[in-house]
Design a protein with these regions (language model features):
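Sec-dependent N-terminal signal peptides
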Residues: 3-13
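Long, intrinsically disordered, low-complexity accessory segments associated with secretion
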Residues: 15-450
Length: 450
């Protein structure tokens, strides 16, 4: 029996995290489907182990599927991962030595051990030592076979010698992906190249070779998964050691209420990797630029206008695809042909035929000034006259939207320009302003109450 156990363990470890299928979610976790294969397993009861698991495994998630005729008698997970916190917390009442900053040493019986301090019973005194002063804690112990990762253990029963094949499935934190878009505008017209990409991150402590990767866009509900804890020795979300750009692209399909992207090639997904892949091929699109001047009813100020870009997610506009939420980096091609960064914004999940609104920053040559010309408040009413001036020093014609937020029960009177009531507290004035020109809007709002 012992020979068969050793053979099964060795065969499995040779294929550690190899040729797995990983479904990656934006919530910071992944579903891993790891193929397993043991040749020439003898008949009878055998115990097998697998320890190539992420330390942030959801402990109630793993399950092993094998051929129909194979019986898995039980499954156990050993998650007693070593940490100094747990080790010394179990040494209460034992003799320890402590060396603090400056070289002084204390010894005695350990009474208390926590994140803030360590308390000792000395020969004739009780000592409380802050943790940040401690350089070394010593105890006469030897740890046999410390465990650094969770281990899965199964017992299977075979009627005859055979090859055992199956799949280990589990959920783990430590994996993530985010969409990143590069919007490259030519600066001459309202046309741009949109490059939809994804950055996938391995923040676990397991390498994956020849990995098939799928990305799911959508917000999933969680019941509160249990993760393996190792005291204060939590796995560090270290800075990535390398960024691998790839020509790998993804095939998008629906997955129930979500969307799933399957990468076209297998990848090596190593610890601390950040890998950039294409979600879609680059698209040539059109956008609409509008300058926004937005104020509340009592505001008086002068400032540059916000630059807003609107993109229609339609086939006619080169898109018509589900756009995952993610950061949009905007670039502008200068007259000399060089590419310059011109701002960034966050794109929310946008379905087909939806509208994307992006803020690129504030315009240098386009300013707005809002002035309250008159304000009169009586016992049962309030009235204010507003003047708004937009200056376009730019050498191009522009579109402007002047947005006014007015609370309460109001009416607009004597508006000098056409406006639209957007909702109960918002109106806006759409304007077209010629190059090197300006436009002035005036209006009065009145409120009455009993």
């Amino acid at each position: 029996m012992r020979k068969s156990v050793c053979l099964l363990m060795f065969s499995l470890l040779l294929g550690q995290a190899d040729q797995a299928i990983m479904t990656l979610y934006k919530d910071g976790f992944a579903l891993v489907k790891q193929p397993v294969n043991w040749p020439n397993v003898p008949p009878g009861v055998s115990t097998i182990e697998y320890d190539q698991l992420p330390s942030r495994l959801f402990i109630d998630s793993p399950f092993l599927t094998l051929q129909d005729e194979i019986v898995v008698r039980w499954q156990r997970i050993n998650s007693n991962i070593f940490s100094g916190e747990k080790f010394f917390s179990r040494k209460l009442g034992k003799y320890v030595e402590i060396k603090i900053s400056g070289g002084k040493t204390y010894e005695g019986i350990l009474l208390e051990y926590n994140n803030a301090k360590v308390t000792l019973q000395g020969k004739s005194e009780v000592l409380s030592i802050p943790r940040d002063k401690i350089e070394l804690i010593f105890t006469e112990d030897r740890i046999e076979n410390p465990q650094f990762k969770p281990t899965l253990i199964w017992e299977i029963n075979l009627e005859k010698s055979m090859q055992v094949q199956g799949e280990l499935i589990y959920l783990s934190a430590g994996f993530d992906w985010n969409a990143v878009y590069r919007l490259v505008m030519n600066g001459k017209d309202n046309q741009a190249n949109l490059v939809p990409e994804a950055i996938i991150s391995n923040r676990s402590d397991v390498d994956f070779s020849d990995l098939t990767l799928r990305l799911v866009e959508g917000e999933l509900h969680h019941a509160g998964q249990k993760k393996i804890s190792s005291g204060s020795q939590q796995y560090s979300r270290a800075q990535s050691s390398r960024l691998a750009s790839s020509s790998v692209s993804a095939d998008q399909k629906s997955l129930g209420d979500y969307h799933i992207y399957t990468l076209s090639e297998v990848l090596n997904f190593m610890v601390d990797d950040n890998i950039t892949v294409q979600l879609y091929k680059p698209r040539v699109i059109n956008y609409e630029k509008t300058y926004i001047f937005e104020n509340k009813e009592r505001s008086q100020r002068e400032e540059p206008l916000v630059v807003e870009l609107k993109i229609i997610n339609s086939e006619e506009n080169g898109l018509g695809i589900p756009l995952p939420a993610g950061k949009v980096e905007m670039y502008l091609t200068s007259k000399g042909g060089s590419l310059e960064f011109s701002g960034e914004d966050y794109l929310v999940q946008t379905p087909k035929e939806g509208t994307v609104l992006l803020t690129a920053g504030r315009a240098f040559d386009i300013t707005g000034k809002r002035t309250i010309l008159n304000y009169d408040r009586q016992r049962n009413s309030e009235e204010a006259s507003i003047q708004i001036q937009i200056k376009n020093i730019h050498d191009e014609d522009i579109q402007v939207r002047v947005v006014e937020h007015i609370s309460g029960d109001w009416v607009i009177r004597d508006a000098s320009s056409m406006y639209t009531k957007e909702d109960a507290t918002t109106i806006y004035f759409p304007l077209n302003i010629d190059a090197e020109d300006n436009k002035i809007i005036t209006y009065t709002y009145r409120k009455e109450w009993k």
